[in-house]
Amino acid sequence: MISNNIKSWRKFSLLGLSLALMNTSCIDYMDNVNPNEVTEEMMGVDNLKTGAFFSQMWRRVVIIKDGEMMDSDYQIAQQLSHDQYAGYIAATLGSTAHNGQYIFQESWVNATFDYAFTGIMAPWQNIHKIATEQGLEEVDALATVVKVAGMHRIADTFGPIPYVNYGASNQYDPLDKIYEKFFEELGSAIEILGNYVSGNSSAKLMSDYDYIYGGSVAQWVKFANTLRLRLAMRVAYANPQLAQEQAELSVNSPYGLIETKADRAELNHGLLSYHHPLQEIAYNFNAGDCRPCASIVAYMDGLNDPRISKYFTLTGDGGYNGVRIGISTSNMANYQGTKVSNLNMDASTTPVVWMTAAESFFLRAEGALRGWNMGGDAKTFYEQGVRVSFEENEAGSADNYLADDTSTPKAYEDQVGSDNYTFSTEVTPAWDEADDFEGKLERIITQKWIALYPDGPEGWSEYRRTGYPELIPVVVNGSNGTIDTELQVRRLPYTRDEKINNAEGVASGIAALGGADNGGTKLWWDKRDR
Protein backbone atom coordinates (compact mmCIF):
# COMPACT_ATOMS: atom_id res chain seq x y z
CA MET A 1 0.00 0.00 0.00
CA ILE A 2 1.27 3.47 -0.88
CA SER A 3 1.43 5.79 2.09
CA ASN A 4 1.84 9.58 2.36
CA ASN A 5 -1.92 10.30 2.45
CA ILE A 6 -2.53 9.71 -1.22
CA LYS A 7 -6.17 9.97 -2.10
CA SER A 8 -8.13 6.98 -3.31
CA TRP A 9 -8.69 8.49 -6.76
CA ARG A 10 -4.94 8.57 -7.26
CA LYS A 11 -4.79 4.88 -6.48
CA PHE A 12 -7.19 4.22 -9.31
CA SER A 13 -5.01 6.32 -11.57
CA LEU A 14 -1.94 4.32 -10.60
CA LEU A 15 -3.85 1.12 -11.20
CA GLY A 16 -4.68 2.36 -14.67
CA LEU A 17 -1.05 3.20 -15.21
CA SER A 18 0.01 -0.25 -14.10
CA LEU A 19 -2.34 -1.79 -16.61
CA ALA A 20 -1.04 0.55 -19.26
CA LEU A 21 2.55 -0.44 -18.65
CA MET A 22 1.92 -4.14 -18.07
CA ASN A 23 4.95 -6.21 -18.99
CA THR A 24 4.80 -7.68 -22.46
CA SER A 25 7.06 -9.97 -24.40
CA CYS A 26 7.19 -7.70 -27.43
CA ILE A 27 8.67 -4.24 -27.09
CA ASP A 28 8.05 -1.69 -29.84
CA TYR A 29 10.82 0.90 -29.67
CA MET A 30 9.35 2.87 -32.55
CA ASP A 31 6.09 3.80 -30.85
CA ASN A 32 5.96 2.70 -27.24
CA VAL A 33 2.39 3.77 -26.58
CA ASN A 34 0.00 1.24 -25.09
CA PRO A 35 -3.54 1.42 -26.52
CA ASN A 36 -4.82 0.62 -23.02
CA GLU A 37 -2.81 3.45 -21.49
CA VAL A 38 -4.75 5.70 -19.16
CA THR A 39 -6.09 8.78 -20.97
CA GLU A 40 -5.37 12.38 -20.06
CA GLU A 41 -8.97 12.74 -18.90
CA MET A 42 -8.58 9.76 -16.58
CA MET A 43 -5.29 11.10 -15.21
CA GLY A 44 -6.54 14.59 -14.62
CA VAL A 45 -4.00 17.38 -14.20
CA ASP A 46 -0.56 17.16 -15.78
CA ASN A 47 1.14 16.94 -12.38
CA LEU A 48 -0.82 13.82 -11.49
CA LYS A 49 -0.21 12.28 -14.88
CA THR A 50 3.52 12.93 -14.73
CA GLY A 51 3.68 11.84 -11.09
CA ALA A 52 2.12 8.49 -11.86
CA PHE A 53 4.80 7.78 -14.44
CA PHE A 54 7.49 8.84 -11.97
CA SER A 55 5.96 6.47 -9.44
CA GLN A 56 6.39 3.65 -11.94
CA MET A 57 10.04 4.47 -12.59
CA TRP A 58 11.06 4.78 -8.95
CA ARG A 59 9.65 1.32 -8.28
CA ARG A 60 11.50 -0.28 -11.21
CA VAL A 61 15.14 0.77 -10.89
CA VAL A 62 15.15 -2.03 -8.33
CA ILE A 63 12.00 -4.14 -8.61
CA ILE A 64 9.74 -4.29 -5.56
CA LYS A 65 6.39 -5.88 -4.88
CA ASP A 66 3.79 -3.19 -5.51
CA GLY A 67 0.59 -4.77 -6.76
CA GLU A 68 1.82 -5.00 -10.34
CA MET A 69 5.19 -6.62 -9.77
CA MET A 70 5.98 -9.41 -7.32
CA ASP A 71 8.99 -10.48 -5.28
CA SER A 72 9.35 -13.33 -7.76
CA ASP A 73 9.89 -10.74 -10.51
CA TYR A 74 12.92 -9.42 -8.63
CA GLN A 75 14.03 -13.00 -8.12
CA ILE A 76 14.11 -13.93 -11.79
CA ALA A 77 15.26 -10.54 -13.08
CA GLN A 78 18.08 -9.89 -10.60
CA GLN A 79 18.58 -12.31 -7.71
CA LEU A 80 19.12 -15.37 -9.89
CA SER A 81 21.72 -13.55 -11.98
CA HIS A 82 23.36 -10.30 -10.83
CA ASP A 83 23.14 -10.97 -7.09
CA GLN A 84 24.79 -14.36 -7.58
CA TYR A 85 27.45 -13.21 -10.03
CA ALA A 86 28.46 -10.43 -7.60
CA GLY A 87 29.21 -13.03 -4.92
CA TYR A 88 26.44 -11.73 -2.65
CA ILE A 89 23.48 -14.11 -2.81
CA ALA A 90 23.41 -17.81 -3.72
CA ALA A 91 20.33 -19.57 -5.04
CA THR A 92 19.24 -22.64 -3.09
CA LEU A 93 16.13 -23.38 -5.09
CA GLY A 94 15.56 -27.02 -6.00
CA SER A 95 16.83 -27.06 -9.55
CA THR A 96 19.46 -28.94 -11.48
CA ALA A 97 19.82 -26.27 -14.19
CA HIS A 98 19.81 -22.53 -13.56
CA ASN A 99 21.58 -19.23 -14.18
CA GLY A 100 23.99 -19.89 -11.32
CA GLN A 101 25.39 -22.78 -13.32
CA TYR A 102 25.61 -20.59 -16.43
CA ILE A 103 22.64 -22.42 -17.92
CA PHE A 104 20.60 -19.35 -18.76
CA GLN A 105 16.86 -19.69 -18.32
CA GLU A 106 15.25 -17.83 -21.21
CA SER A 107 12.23 -16.56 -19.28
CA TRP A 108 14.47 -15.15 -16.55
CA VAL A 109 16.70 -13.35 -19.04
CA ASN A 110 13.60 -12.03 -20.80
CA ALA A 111 12.41 -10.60 -17.49
CA THR A 112 15.67 -8.74 -16.86
CA PHE A 113 15.41 -7.01 -20.23
CA ASP A 114 11.65 -6.51 -20.52
CA TYR A 115 10.96 -5.16 -17.02
CA ALA A 116 13.45 -2.34 -17.56
CA PHE A 117 12.00 -1.24 -20.88
CA THR A 118 8.36 -1.41 -19.79
CA GLY A 119 8.99 -0.04 -16.29
CA ILE A 120 11.63 2.61 -16.95
CA MET A 121 11.94 3.54 -20.61
CA ALA A 122 8.22 3.58 -21.40
CA PRO A 123 7.20 5.87 -18.50
CA TRP A 124 10.26 8.05 -19.12
CA GLN A 125 9.13 8.50 -22.71
CA ASN A 126 5.73 9.68 -21.50
CA ILE A 127 7.25 12.09 -18.97
CA HIS A 128 9.63 13.44 -21.60
CA LYS A 129 6.73 14.11 -23.96
CA ILE A 130 4.60 15.84 -21.31
CA ALA A 131 7.49 17.86 -19.88
CA THR A 132 8.60 18.99 -23.33
CA GLU A 133 5.09 20.08 -24.27
CA GLN A 134 4.66 21.97 -20.99
CA GLY A 135 8.15 23.49 -20.94
CA LEU A 136 9.04 21.72 -17.67
CA GLU A 137 12.74 21.13 -18.24
CA GLU A 138 13.42 20.40 -14.57
CA VAL A 139 10.83 17.59 -14.58
CA ASP A 140 12.38 16.17 -17.73
CA ALA A 141 15.83 16.40 -16.12
CA LEU A 142 14.73 14.53 -13.01
CA ALA A 143 13.15 11.76 -15.08
CA THR A 144 16.33 11.47 -17.12
CA VAL A 145 18.45 10.97 -14.00
CA VAL A 146 16.18 8.14 -12.90
CA LYS A 147 16.27 6.68 -16.40
CA VAL A 148 20.07 6.58 -16.41
CA ALA A 149 20.10 5.09 -12.91
CA GLY A 150 17.98 2.21 -14.11
CA MET A 151 19.18 1.69 -17.64
CA HIS A 152 22.91 1.68 -17.03
CA ARG A 153 22.28 -1.51 -15.08
CA ILE A 154 20.69 -3.05 -18.17
CA ALA A 155 23.41 -1.82 -20.53
CA ASP A 156 26.00 -3.23 -18.12
CA THR A 157 24.15 -6.55 -18.21
CA PHE A 158 23.70 -7.09 -21.94
CA GLY A 159 25.99 -4.58 -23.66
CA PRO A 160 24.50 -2.83 -26.70
CA ILE A 161 20.77 -2.10 -26.24
CA PRO A 162 18.24 0.30 -27.84
CA TYR A 163 18.87 3.57 -26.01
CA VAL A 164 20.37 6.56 -27.84
CA ASN A 165 17.48 6.92 -30.30
CA TYR A 166 14.87 5.14 -28.22
CA GLY A 167 11.42 5.76 -29.67
CA ALA A 168 12.74 6.42 -33.17
CA SER A 169 14.69 3.25 -33.91
CA ASN A 170 14.77 -0.41 -32.92
CA GLN A 171 18.52 -0.64 -33.49
CA TYR A 172 20.87 -1.55 -30.64
CA ASP A 173 23.47 1.12 -29.87
CA PRO A 174 27.15 0.35 -29.19
CA LEU A 175 27.93 0.52 -25.48
CA ASP A 176 30.48 3.29 -25.87
CA LYS A 177 27.83 5.45 -27.57
CA ILE A 178 25.35 4.63 -24.81
CA TYR A 179 27.85 5.79 -22.19
CA GLU A 180 28.49 8.99 -24.12
CA LYS A 181 24.73 9.54 -24.03
CA PHE A 182 24.63 8.83 -20.29
CA PHE A 183 27.25 11.51 -19.67
CA GLU A 184 25.50 13.98 -21.97
CA GLU A 185 22.17 13.40 -20.23
CA LEU A 186 23.58 13.58 -16.71
CA GLY A 187 25.58 16.71 -17.49
CA SER A 188 22.49 18.47 -18.79
CA ALA A 189 20.31 17.26 -15.92
CA ILE A 190 22.81 18.36 -13.29
CA GLU A 191 22.97 21.84 -14.81
CA ILE A 192 19.18 22.17 -15.04
CA LEU A 193 18.47 20.82 -11.56
CA GLY A 194 21.37 22.80 -10.14
CA ASN A 195 19.91 26.01 -11.53
CA TYR A 196 16.50 25.03 -10.18
CA VAL A 197 17.85 24.66 -6.65
CA SER A 198 20.29 27.58 -6.85
CA GLY A 199 19.49 30.11 -4.15
CA ASN A 200 16.86 27.82 -2.65
CA SER A 201 18.42 24.69 -1.16
CA SER A 202 15.01 23.47 0.03
CA ALA A 203 13.43 23.52 -3.45
CA LYS A 204 11.06 20.62 -4.07
CA LEU A 205 10.01 18.81 -7.23
CA MET A 206 7.37 16.08 -7.59
CA SER A 207 7.40 15.68 -3.81
CA ASP A 208 4.07 13.83 -3.65
CA TYR A 209 5.49 11.07 -5.84
CA ASP A 210 9.15 10.92 -4.82
CA TYR A 211 9.83 7.80 -2.73
CA ILE A 212 13.58 8.46 -2.60
CA TYR A 213 14.14 12.04 -1.48
CA GLY A 214 10.63 13.36 -0.93
CA GLY A 215 11.12 15.92 -3.69
CA SER A 216 14.44 17.38 -2.48
CA VAL A 217 16.14 18.68 -5.62
CA ALA A 218 19.41 19.33 -3.78
CA GLN A 219 19.66 15.65 -2.92
CA TRP A 220 18.77 14.58 -6.44
CA VAL A 221 21.61 16.72 -7.82
CA LYS A 222 24.03 15.03 -5.41
CA PHE A 223 22.76 11.67 -6.59
CA ALA A 224 23.15 12.63 -10.25
CA ASN A 225 26.68 13.86 -9.59
CA THR A 226 27.63 10.66 -7.79
CA LEU A 227 26.00 8.56 -10.51
CA ARG A 228 28.13 10.37 -13.07
CA LEU A 229 31.21 9.58 -10.97
CA ARG A 230 30.20 5.90 -10.83
CA LEU A 231 29.80 5.69 -14.59
CA ALA A 232 33.03 7.60 -15.16
CA MET A 233 34.92 4.98 -13.20
CA ARG A 234 33.19 2.23 -15.15
CA VAL A 235 34.94 3.33 -18.35
CA ALA A 236 38.36 3.89 -16.77
CA TYR A 237 40.00 1.07 -18.72
CA ALA A 238 38.06 1.59 -21.96
CA ASN A 239 38.41 5.37 -22.28
CA PRO A 240 40.71 6.78 -19.56
CA GLN A 241 40.50 10.36 -20.84
CA LEU A 242 36.70 10.40 -20.82
CA ALA A 243 36.65 8.72 -17.42
CA GLN A 244 38.93 11.31 -15.84
CA GLU A 245 37.09 14.19 -17.46
CA GLN A 246 33.68 13.07 -16.20
CA ALA A 247 34.95 12.10 -12.75
CA GLU A 248 36.57 15.48 -12.22
CA LEU A 249 33.42 17.24 -13.41
CA SER A 250 31.48 15.45 -10.68
CA VAL A 251 33.99 16.04 -7.91
CA ASN A 252 34.39 19.72 -8.80
CA SER A 253 30.66 20.35 -9.15
CA PRO A 254 29.34 22.96 -6.69
CA TYR A 255 26.36 20.73 -5.95
CA GLY A 256 28.34 18.06 -4.13
CA LEU A 257 28.26 14.27 -3.85
CA ILE A 258 26.45 11.79 -1.62
CA GLU A 259 28.58 11.66 1.55
CA THR A 260 26.18 10.87 4.39
CA LYS A 261 23.59 8.24 5.17
CA ALA A 262 20.94 10.98 5.10
CA ASP A 263 21.76 11.67 1.46
CA ARG A 264 22.12 8.12 0.19
CA ALA A 265 19.58 7.04 -2.41
CA GLU A 266 17.10 4.54 -1.00
CA LEU A 267 13.41 3.79 -1.19
CA ASN A 268 12.20 5.52 1.95
CA HIS A 269 10.00 3.37 4.19
CA GLY A 270 8.45 6.59 5.48
CA LEU A 271 7.26 7.48 1.99
CA LEU A 272 6.40 4.05 0.62
CA SER A 273 5.13 0.90 2.30
CA TYR A 274 7.20 -2.00 0.95
CA HIS A 275 9.68 -4.71 1.88
CA HIS A 276 13.01 -5.73 0.39
CA PRO A 277 12.30 -8.60 -2.02
CA LEU A 278 15.34 -10.53 -0.80
CA GLN A 279 13.77 -10.76 2.66
CA GLU A 280 10.71 -12.50 1.25
CA ILE A 281 12.75 -14.77 -1.03
CA ALA A 282 15.11 -15.81 1.77
CA TYR A 283 12.45 -16.54 4.37
CA ASN A 284 9.18 -17.34 2.63
CA PHE A 285 9.94 -18.78 -0.80
CA ASN A 286 9.91 -22.55 -0.20
CA ALA A 287 11.31 -21.81 3.26
CA GLY A 288 14.24 -20.09 1.57
CA ASP A 289 15.17 -19.85 -2.12
CA CYS A 290 18.40 -18.00 -1.37
CA ARG A 291 21.16 -17.74 1.20
CA PRO A 292 24.30 -15.63 1.60
CA CYS A 293 26.97 -16.39 -0.96
CA ALA A 294 30.09 -18.17 0.26
CA SER A 295 32.35 -15.44 -1.15
CA ILE A 296 31.14 -12.47 0.88
CA VAL A 297 30.66 -14.50 4.07
CA ALA A 298 34.21 -15.89 3.84
CA TYR A 299 35.65 -12.42 3.27
CA MET A 300 33.79 -10.74 6.11
CA ASP A 301 34.32 -13.63 8.52
CA GLY A 302 38.04 -13.83 7.79
CA LEU A 303 38.51 -10.06 7.99
CA ASN A 304 36.69 -9.97 11.35
CA ASP A 305 34.30 -7.45 9.85
CA PRO A 306 31.71 -6.22 12.41
CA ARG A 307 29.25 -5.56 9.58
CA ILE A 308 28.79 -9.30 9.14
CA SER A 309 26.20 -9.46 11.92
CA LYS A 310 24.27 -6.66 10.21
CA TYR A 311 24.28 -8.53 6.92
CA PHE A 312 23.79 -12.16 7.98
CA THR A 313 22.46 -14.38 10.76
CA LEU A 314 24.45 -16.85 12.84
CA THR A 315 24.46 -20.55 12.05
CA GLY A 316 23.50 -23.16 14.63
CA ASP A 317 27.11 -23.48 15.80
CA GLY A 318 27.43 -19.73 16.37
CA GLY A 319 29.41 -18.92 13.25
CA TYR A 320 28.75 -17.70 9.73
CA ASN A 321 28.58 -19.80 6.60
CA GLY A 322 27.38 -19.25 3.06
CA VAL A 323 26.61 -21.25 -0.07
CA ARG A 324 28.63 -21.47 -3.27
CA ILE A 325 26.92 -20.46 -6.48
CA GLY A 326 26.39 -22.98 -9.22
CA ILE A 327 25.38 -25.80 -6.91
CA SER A 328 23.16 -28.59 -8.17
CA THR A 329 20.55 -29.77 -5.74
CA SER A 330 17.10 -31.27 -5.71
CA ASN A 331 17.02 -31.35 -1.90
CA MET A 332 16.55 -27.83 -0.64
CA ALA A 333 16.21 -29.01 2.96
CA ASN A 334 20.01 -29.11 3.19
CA TYR A 335 20.05 -25.32 2.95
CA GLN A 336 17.01 -24.51 5.06
CA GLY A 337 18.37 -25.52 8.44
CA THR A 338 20.88 -23.87 10.73
CA LYS A 339 24.05 -25.06 9.00
CA VAL A 340 23.93 -22.03 6.71
CA SER A 341 23.47 -18.36 7.61
CA ASN A 342 20.51 -16.36 6.34
CA LEU A 343 20.08 -12.75 5.30
CA ASN A 344 19.63 -10.39 8.24
CA MET A 345 16.75 -8.38 6.85
CA ASP A 346 13.63 -6.91 8.40
CA ALA A 347 10.49 -6.58 6.29
CA SER A 348 9.58 -3.17 7.73
CA THR A 349 12.96 -1.47 8.01
CA THR A 350 15.52 -2.90 5.56
CA PRO A 351 15.67 -0.45 2.64
CA VAL A 352 16.27 -0.98 -1.04
CA VAL A 353 19.36 1.16 -1.63
CA TRP A 354 20.22 2.56 -5.05
CA MET A 355 23.47 4.16 -3.95
CA THR A 356 25.31 4.15 -0.64
CA ALA A 357 27.17 7.12 0.76
CA ALA A 358 30.30 4.99 1.12
CA GLU A 359 30.48 4.45 -2.63
CA SER A 360 31.38 8.05 -3.38
CA PHE A 361 34.47 7.80 -1.15
CA PHE A 362 35.67 4.56 -2.74
CA LEU A 363 35.17 6.06 -6.19
CA ARG A 364 37.31 9.04 -5.23
CA ALA A 365 39.89 6.73 -3.65
CA GLU A 366 40.31 4.93 -6.96
CA GLY A 367 40.34 8.20 -8.87
CA ALA A 368 43.07 9.57 -6.62
CA LEU A 369 45.01 6.32 -7.06
CA ARG A 370 44.85 6.92 -10.81
CA GLY A 371 46.23 10.43 -10.40
CA TRP A 372 42.97 12.26 -11.03
CA ASN A 373 42.02 15.45 -9.20
CA MET A 374 39.65 14.09 -6.56
CA GLY A 375 40.33 16.66 -3.86
CA GLY A 376 42.29 14.29 -1.64
CA ASP A 377 44.46 11.19 -1.49
CA ALA A 378 43.55 7.54 -1.97
CA LYS A 379 44.25 6.45 1.63
CA THR A 380 42.06 9.15 3.17
CA PHE A 381 39.14 8.47 0.84
CA TYR A 382 39.53 4.71 1.33
CA GLU A 383 39.35 4.99 5.10
CA GLN A 384 36.45 7.45 4.90
CA GLY A 385 34.60 4.95 2.73
CA VAL A 386 35.02 2.20 5.31
CA ARG A 387 34.00 4.48 8.18
CA VAL A 388 30.90 5.73 6.37
CA SER A 389 29.90 2.15 5.51
CA PHE A 390 30.19 1.25 9.20
CA GLU A 391 27.97 4.24 10.01
CA GLU A 392 25.42 3.29 7.36
CA ASN A 393 25.19 -0.21 8.81
CA GLU A 394 25.37 0.88 12.47
CA ALA A 395 28.41 -1.35 12.99
CA GLY A 396 30.25 0.81 15.52
CA SER A 397 33.75 2.21 15.22
CA ALA A 398 35.94 1.20 12.29
CA ASP A 399 39.23 2.13 14.01
CA ASN A 400 40.37 -1.38 14.96
CA TYR A 401 39.23 -2.76 11.63
CA LEU A 402 41.22 -0.20 9.65
CA ALA A 403 44.30 -0.96 11.74
CA ASP A 404 44.09 -4.72 11.07
CA ASP A 405 46.97 -5.70 8.79
CA THR A 406 46.87 -9.45 9.43
CA SER A 407 43.31 -10.72 8.88
CA THR A 408 42.60 -12.17 5.44
CA PRO A 409 39.60 -13.91 3.81
CA LYS A 410 38.79 -17.21 5.45
CA ALA A 411 38.90 -20.50 3.56
CA TYR A 412 35.39 -21.67 2.74
CA GLU A 413 34.26 -24.92 4.34
CA ASP A 414 31.08 -26.32 2.85
CA GLN A 415 28.73 -27.22 5.71
CA VAL A 416 26.39 -29.19 3.46
CA GLY A 417 28.57 -30.79 0.81
CA SER A 418 32.27 -30.95 0.01
CA ASP A 419 32.73 -27.91 -2.23
CA ASN A 420 35.45 -26.22 -0.19
CA TYR A 421 37.62 -23.33 -1.42
CA THR A 422 40.83 -21.61 -0.32
CA PHE A 423 41.50 -18.04 -1.43
CA SER A 424 44.81 -16.96 -2.92
CA THR A 425 44.33 -13.31 -1.95
CA GLU A 426 45.98 -11.93 1.17
CA VAL A 427 44.12 -8.62 1.22
CA THR A 428 43.65 -7.05 4.66
CA PRO A 429 41.59 -4.06 5.85
CA ALA A 430 44.58 -1.86 6.75
CA TRP A 431 45.92 0.46 4.07
CA ASP A 432 49.52 -0.22 3.05
CA GLU A 433 51.22 2.69 1.35
CA ALA A 434 53.99 0.34 0.22
CA ASP A 435 51.57 -1.61 -1.97
CA ASP A 436 51.80 -1.24 -5.73
CA PHE A 437 48.88 0.05 -7.81
CA GLU A 438 47.19 -3.35 -8.00
CA GLY A 439 47.53 -3.99 -4.28
CA LYS A 440 45.91 -0.67 -3.46
CA LEU A 441 43.21 -1.13 -6.08
CA GLU A 442 42.34 -4.58 -4.72
CA ARG A 443 41.97 -3.13 -1.22
CA ILE A 444 39.73 -0.29 -2.44
CA ILE A 445 37.49 -2.52 -4.54
CA THR A 446 37.26 -5.22 -1.88
CA GLN A 447 35.95 -2.76 0.69
CA LYS A 448 33.74 -1.09 -1.90
CA TRP A 449 32.28 -4.51 -2.76
CA ILE A 450 31.51 -5.22 0.89
CA ALA A 451 29.90 -1.78 1.28
CA LEU A 452 27.78 -2.20 -1.87
CA TYR A 453 26.07 -5.38 -0.61
CA PRO A 454 23.43 -6.46 -1.66
CA ASP A 455 23.51 -4.37 -4.86
CA GLY A 456 24.22 -7.23 -7.26
CA PRO A 457 24.27 -5.27 -10.53
CA GLU A 458 26.90 -2.86 -9.22
CA GLY A 459 28.96 -5.51 -7.43
CA TRP A 460 29.06 -7.71 -10.53
CA SER A 461 29.97 -4.80 -12.81
CA GLU A 462 32.87 -3.77 -10.59
CA TYR A 463 34.14 -7.35 -10.40
CA ARG A 464 34.13 -7.58 -14.19
CA ARG A 465 35.75 -4.17 -14.59
CA THR A 466 38.60 -4.67 -12.11
CA GLY A 467 38.93 -8.40 -11.43
CA TYR A 468 38.46 -7.71 -7.70
CA PRO A 469 37.67 -9.13 -5.27
CA GLU A 470 38.65 -12.75 -5.80
CA LEU A 471 35.31 -14.56 -6.03
CA ILE A 472 34.73 -18.27 -5.53
CA PRO A 473 33.92 -19.77 -8.94
CA VAL A 474 30.80 -21.78 -9.74
CA VAL A 475 30.60 -25.42 -8.70
CA VAL A 476 28.95 -26.49 -11.96
CA ASN A 477 29.66 -24.68 -15.23
CA GLY A 478 27.00 -25.70 -17.74
CA SER A 479 27.92 -23.18 -20.44
CA ASN A 480 29.40 -25.78 -22.79
CA GLY A 481 32.69 -23.95 -22.86
CA THR A 482 31.39 -20.47 -23.65
CA ILE A 483 32.20 -19.10 -20.18
CA ASP A 484 35.59 -19.51 -18.51
CA THR A 485 35.09 -20.85 -14.98
CA GLU A 486 37.89 -18.73 -13.52
CA LEU A 487 37.08 -15.50 -15.40
CA GLN A 488 33.38 -16.13 -14.67
CA VAL A 489 30.32 -14.82 -16.49
CA ARG A 490 30.69 -11.46 -18.27
CA ARG A 491 27.18 -10.70 -19.52
CA LEU A 492 23.71 -12.10 -20.16
CA PRO A 493 22.85 -13.15 -23.73
CA TYR A 494 20.14 -11.35 -25.65
CA THR A 495 16.60 -12.48 -25.03
CA ARG A 496 14.61 -15.07 -26.91
CA ASP A 497 11.71 -12.67 -27.44
CA GLU A 498 13.92 -9.97 -28.90
CA LYS A 499 15.47 -12.48 -31.29
CA ILE A 500 11.97 -13.38 -32.47
CA ASN A 501 10.37 -9.94 -32.54
CA ASN A 502 13.34 -7.68 -33.28
CA ALA A 503 15.82 -9.86 -35.14
CA GLU A 504 17.30 -6.92 -37.02
CA GLY A 505 17.86 -4.99 -33.81
CA VAL A 506 19.51 -7.96 -32.10
CA ALA A 507 21.75 -8.45 -35.13
CA SER A 508 22.91 -4.84 -34.78
CA GLY A 509 23.58 -5.48 -31.10
CA ILE A 510 25.70 -8.55 -31.77
CA ALA A 511 27.66 -6.65 -34.41
CA ALA A 512 28.32 -3.83 -31.92
CA LEU A 513 29.17 -6.35 -29.19
CA GLY A 514 32.09 -7.59 -31.24
CA GLY A 515 31.78 -11.19 -30.14
CA ALA A 516 29.44 -14.12 -29.78
CA ASP A 517 26.09 -13.62 -28.09
CA ASN A 518 26.94 -15.66 -25.01
CA GLY A 519 27.89 -15.16 -21.38
CA GLY A 520 31.62 -15.25 -22.03
CA THR A 521 31.87 -12.22 -24.32
CA LYS A 522 33.22 -9.11 -22.63
CA LEU A 523 31.51 -5.73 -22.77
CA TRP A 524 33.17 -2.61 -24.14
CA TRP A 525 34.35 -1.37 -20.72
CA ASP A 526 35.50 -4.86 -19.60
CA LYS A 527 39.14 -4.66 -20.71
CA ARG A 528 41.15 -6.58 -18.13
CA ASP A 529 42.42 -10.16 -18.45
CA ARG A 530 41.65 -11.06 -14.84
Q: What residue spans do the PLM features occupy?
A:
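Structured, solvent-exposed acidic/aromatic patches
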Residues: 44-48, 90-398, 433-441, 447
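Membrane-proximal, proline-rich intrinsically disordered regions
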Residues: 2, 26-84, 469, 479-530
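Bacterial Sec-dependent N-terminal signal peptides
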Residues: 1-35
